[in-house]
Each structure stands twice: as structure tokens, then as C-alpha cells.
Amino acid sequence: MSTEGLIAYCRPGFEPDLAAELSHHVAIKGLPAYAKTERNSGYVMMLGAPREQINAAIAFENLIFARQKYTLIDELKNLDIQDRISPVLEALGGKGRYGDLSVEHPDSDAAKQLAGLAKAFGNALRPALRKRGLLTDKPNEKLPTLHVIFISNNHLLL
């Protein structure tokens, strides 16, 4: 089952503030979305409505606590650490083509240890995406960037 919505980064410790801010904006638009977060994680997810609707309801320039926001294609949990690429490719099937790839992690103490893994995974994922036709050969600003976010070594957000 797909988890879609929106993810927004914030400074660790400000998750409740960002969750309230995002919830306010979706409530104004009458969307049945809800915030999901963990204290000091550095991010908040908005779930419960189509990602396009949530994204349209929340203009980045109106946010105080968000550092960045992205549409959330899927959440992949309990991944086999021997093969993280296959579930990513499966989750992206039929979801469009991307002009660039960014593999990252939230700015939290717990997630900083994932920096090396994120870089190595990006180097392995990039050719697999290109082989499937999901990523252009060269960066293309006219197409969206695919953000792959490491929450832990076996938990990714797309």
C-alpha cells in the first residue's frame, strides 16, 4: 500500500510547530490530512490526502518552520539492506520521469550517521533509475528532482 502526501524538513525540536503549521494550511483547504512526526527527527509528514492536493494547499513561502517541502511518493519501511534498489524502482513504477536525483537525510543527530550511506546509495541507484528510463542521462531542470530520504538504513521516503 502506498503512503503519499508531503514531507517537510525543519530544525530538530520544531516538529510540533511545523506539524501545527501544516495542519492549519490543509484545514483551511478542507483536506482530511494529518501530520505524522517524531520529536527531534527534523521532519514532518502530512498524510491522508493525495500528494498533489496537499502540496497545492501549502505554499512554501507561507511556512515559517519549514526548511524545505517535497511531495511524498511513498514510504518504504523494513527494507532488506542487501537490496534497497528494487523496492525503490517498484514504488516509482508509473510515477513519472525525473531530471535529477538527490539522496539525503534529515538534519538530525540520529540521521547524520546516514550521510555516507546516502551518498553510496545514490551512486548505486542513479544507473538503475536510468536503465529503467526513470532518470534522464544528464540533469534536466524541466523535470522534477527525485528526493530519496534516508530515515534509517532500512527506511526510506521517496
Kindly give the residue locations of the regions a language model identified.
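N-terminal basic/disordered segments at the start of proteins
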Residues: 1, 15-16
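Non-catalytic nucleic-acid substrate-recognition regions in nucleic-acid-modifying enzymes
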Residues: 3-4, 9-11, 20-144
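C-terminal edge-of-domain segments
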Residues: 144-158
